[in-house]
């Protein structure tokens, strides 16, 4: 996150744990959660100093109370930081389909309460119900480990994202690899559905 901030990236979103990852072995899930706890403890100590905001995407209800408390603590620190500071988004117990369903349920509940009408809904309003509300859609999605699939990641938000695939495994994905991905992205002509000029 610090390197991204230093080279001028404004937002970074990482897929830490998906809704499907609960299907992994208990040992593997425990190891991932232990790593997350370590990361969050470090974040609590360094966020203010480094001016790094932290935001979570996903349904936090099944997450262990200790991790939820740490996430809440990072939320409180983020509240005191400038909106202009770098922001790291962590997808935790996140799935793109689940995010869309949760957004639809929130909108439907507001319709049932008379706060909204179905005809109010457009893309802009719908985006306010997503975990990523107020955050720009990603310009670049990097897929490491030789995989060439979305894996249920930011399904709504990636409509016009550029994709970069690499065989480099996630643990080995370093600053040099990130620089390669950014250089590849910068060489592209983004048309957002239009024609090349």
Across the structure, where does each feature detected by a protein language model lie?
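Flexible, compositionally biased loop and terminal segments
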Residues: 1-197
